[in-house]
C-alpha cells in the first residue's frame, strides 16, 4: 500500500520495457556479467511470492535476481518473469539489463513451477507455460503476428520464453500500451471496447494492415476464449521517424 506510482517508476529506472527511463533510480544496477542459474531464479521468485523472510542467497545474488525477476512490475503482468539475454548456440543465460554481444538476444522468460504463481487469486496449474506455448502456435496458424517464442527446458521445468520486440540489435525501441496512451486502467473491466481501441489506432495513424491485424486478433481472442485481452496487452511501437505501428501480439 505504501508503494506509490513514483516509487514504481524509480524502481524501474532504466530496466523497463520500451525506451523510457526514469531517474533517479531507487536501486543500483548489478554489473555482474556472468551466467544466470535458472533454477535459482525460479526459487527466488517462489520465495518472493511466498513472502518468505529468509531467502537463501548472498547479497550479490539477491541484487542480481531481484533486478532480473519481475513480479508484476516493469515487465508487466501478474506472473513472475525475468528479462534475460539468451545465447541460443550455447544455451547460456545472462542478465537482460546489460549490453550484450551479438551472440545473445533479449528475451522475456515466464517461469514454470513457481509457488503461488497466478492471476486473480488463482494459482497456475503445473506446466501452465506449455498451455501458453500452445496458444502461441495456434495464434501463428491463425495469422497472428507474434515474436518468436520458445520453451526453455531446465531441471524438469518448462519455462516460456518470448523474444523482446522492444529491443532491436541491442537498441531500445519506444513502446506504449493502449492503456498508457489512452489513460485507461486495465483493472477496470468494460472501460474500452474493441471498437474504441480501433478508434485510438486511427488517431495515431496506424496503417490499415495494422487495423486488419488487430481485427484478426479480436476474432482469435473470442474463438480461443483468451480473456487476457486488456488494454495493457495491446501495445504500439514508434520508430525514429515518429511513426506508430501495432506491436506483435503477446
What do these predicted ranges mean?
Residues 1-250:
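Phosphate/dinucleotide-binding and metal-coordinating scaffold of catalytic cores
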Amino acid at each position: 500500500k505504501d508503494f506509490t506510482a513514483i516509487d514504481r517508476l524509480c524502481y524501474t529506472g532504466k530496466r523497463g520495457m520500451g525506451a523510457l527511463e526514469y531517474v533517479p533510480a531507487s536501486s543500483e544496477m548489478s554489473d555482474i556479467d556472468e551466467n544466470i542459474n535458472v533454477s535459482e531464479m525460479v526459487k527466488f521468485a517462489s520465495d518472493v511470492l511466498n513472502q518468505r523472510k529468509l531467502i537463501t542467497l548472498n547479497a550479490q545474488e539477491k541484487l542480481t535476481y531481484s533486478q532480473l525477476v519481475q513480479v508484476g512490475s516493469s515487465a508487466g503482468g501478474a506472473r513472475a518473469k525475468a528479462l534475460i539475454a539468451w545465447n541460443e548456440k550455447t544455451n547460456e543465460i545472462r542478465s537482460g539489463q546489460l549490453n550484450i554481444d551479438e551472440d545473445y538476444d533479449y528475451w522475456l522468460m515466464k517461469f514454470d513451477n513457481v509457488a503461488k504463481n497466478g492471476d486473480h487469486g488463482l494459482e497456475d496449474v503445473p506446466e501452465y507455460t506449455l498451455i501458453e506455448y500452445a496458444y502461441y502456435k495456434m495464434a501463428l496458424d491463425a495469422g497472428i503476428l507474434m515474436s518468436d517464442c520458445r520453451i526453455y527446458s531446465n531441471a524438469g521445468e518448462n519455462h516460456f520464453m518470448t523474444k523482446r520486440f522492444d529491443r532491436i540489435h541491442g537498441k531500445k525501441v519506444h513502446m506504449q500500451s493502449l492503456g498508457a496512451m489512452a489513460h485507461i486502467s486495465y483493472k477496470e473491466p468494460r472501460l474500452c471496447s474493441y471498437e474504441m481501441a480501433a478508434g485510438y489506432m486511427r488517431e495515431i495513424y496506424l496503417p490499415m494492415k495494422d487495423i486488419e491485424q488487430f481485427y484478426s486478433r479480436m476474432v482469435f481472442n473470442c474463438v480461443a476464449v483468451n480473456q487476457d485481452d486488456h488494454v495493457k496487452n495491446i501495445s504500439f511501437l514508434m520508430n525514429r521517424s515518429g511513426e506508430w505501428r501495432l506491436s506483435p501480439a503477446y
